[in-house]
Design a protein with these regions (language model features):
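Helix-to-loop junction immediately C-terminal to a conserved catalytic motif
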Residues: 54
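Conserved ABC transporter NBD signature motif
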Residues: 62-70, 79
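Conserved catalytic motifs of ABC-family nucleotide-binding domains
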Residues: 90-99, 108
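Conserved ABC ATPase signature
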Residues: 134-138, 142
Length: 225
């Protein structure tokens, strides 16, 4: 196995509301090209953990390091381009699909390759004509795939995926799983994926399981048959 560089490290991270511990004493690392799943029953803090890594909420205790730096010291805009978060409910904006896919390039003051969008759409079995389709005319599954394609335009080092296949049918769910797996291996992107779907475990290097009652964790390597 080739040596991987460290991208992310959580050290005894915890988060609580005024009355309840949501996650507690979470520690793990994520290396370049590594694929980790986060599983566990509803209410154990999976999405909260992902939002902390995405710098959408701050931990009450512990520290999160990205390439050795505390993420609270980094520019939120720059960090979120390198650590890209895709929510369970996709948040699209503007009038058309094109408005969403061009956005990551605009904020970097760059232009995509002429075929970039067509190639990415084809990977997700979407026609190039969808670029001019109004956001309001998209199905739930189309919205989720467009949101994921938009996140890939940031060329991130880490993808954070929160139940992203929940709105997809079985065919598209398998397709998205395979596409992300290939993308991770080709680009050496690291992935943290929150899921309830045991079928997605087949692509994971390791599985982090959060337990109820303050989201304590256990971590295990996935052994392929």
């Amino acid at each position: 196995m080739t040596e991987r560089s460290m991208l992310l490290e959580l050290k005894q991270v915890g988060y609580r509301t005024a009355t309840t511990k949501i996650v507690n004493n979470i520690s793990f690392t994520l290396q370049r090209g590594e694929f980790k799943l986060i599983t566990g029953p509803s209410g154990c803090g999976k999405s909260t953990l992902l939002k902390m890594v995405a710098s959408l909420i701050s931990p009450d205790i512990g520290v999160i390091l990205f390439e050795g730096q505390d993420i609270t010291t980094l520019s939120p805009e720059a960090y979120r381009q390198q650590v890209s978060y895709c929510a369970q409910t996709p948040a699209l904006f503007g009038d058309t699909v094109y408005d969403n896919l061009i956005f990551p390039w605009q904020i970097r003051h760059q232009r995509p390759q002429p075929t970039a969008f067509a190639d990415d759409l084809a990977r997700f079995e979407l026609p190039e004509t969808i670029l001019q389709k109004p956001i309001t005319a998209l199905s739930g599954g189309e919205k989720q795939r467009i949101a994921l394609i938009r996140n890939l335009q940031f060329l991130p080092k880490i993808l954070l995926l929160d139940e992203i296949t929940s709105a997809l049918d079985e065919h598209n769910k398998r397709n998205v799983n395979d596409i992300i797996h290939r993308y991770v291996r080709d680009k050496q992107v690291a992935v943290l994926w929150v899921t309830h779907d045991k079928d997605e475990i087949q692509h994971a290097d390791k599985v982090i399981t959060l337990t109820p009652f303050a989201g304590e964790m256990q971590e295990a390597r996935y052994e392929r048959a």
